[in-house]
Amino acid sequence: MSTSREDSVYLAKLAEQAERYEEMVENMKTVASSGQELSVEERNLLSVAYKNVIGARRASWRIVSSIEQKEESKEKSEHQVELICSYRSKIETELTKISDDILSVLDSHLIPSATTGESKVFYYKMKGDYHRYLAEFSSGDAREKATNASLEAYKTASEIATTELPPTHPIRLGLALNFSVFYYEIQNSPDKACHLAKQAFDDAIAELDTLSEESYKDSTLIMQLLRDNLTLWTSDMSESGQAEDQQQQQQHQQQQPPAAAEGEAPK
């Protein structure tokens, strides 16, 4: 007997409570592939499911990459480095599978069925995010492809957000937060990152009095994250000076810096 849409959503919530995120993904993927537009609750459940599944692997990748860098600096550690490299590749395979999975659902079902500006921004932001996650560990042509796809998705989301969502909308703010992280961490463009983050923050501040009570907490939280990133980035830029681009490239390839805050849709 096939599981109903209502049951799949309930099982996804149950899996979330049990912290069984792979099963949460499977249940929400079933709902997302139905061809019907998702409700706000359903799309948030989908986002949370994939975010937890990939978030664990991204954290693992950063830790293993850091250990790899330390071992490479030691003498007589060639065998250990080979083991670490193999283990890192295993994590990268998992990251690729998860990202390709949600990107396929987005392109085949969610984006084509989206009818509101809010849902379109939400899904194009997700598309930008998961291509960005691929770019984090890829190299060569694969990295260039993921970077370009991420940039295109973020730009599309931004164009829609600018015309259809107010500056204080949490999804528009979350998009600005993640798009600025893309500029800083993937494209090594701190100036673009800071400009985008500051513009989003300033635009939201200017219309803070129009903020609805229901989204006040979510919006102000993301605004704080934007400000935190600006503080972190401007500090890094002043310390690094002319060596910024080279340093950022080395950090990406070897050891990840303290991660900038990213924004997710409120539940």
Curated annotation (Swiss-Prot):
The modification N-acetylserine is found at residue 2. Residues 236-267 are annotated as: Disordered. One of its GO terms (cellular component) is cytoplasmic stress granule. GO terms for molecular function: DNA replication origin binding; enzyme activator activity; phosphoserine residue binding; RNA polymerase II-specific DNA-binding transcription factor binding. Pfam families: 14-3-3. Present with 158000 molecules/cell in log phase SD medium. Homodimer. Interacts with NTH1 (via N-terminus when phosphorylated by PKA); the interaction is direct and activates NTH1. Interacts with FIN1. This is Protein BMH1. The lineage of its organism: Eukaryota, Fungi, Dikarya, Ascomycota, Saccharomycotina. The gene is BMH1.
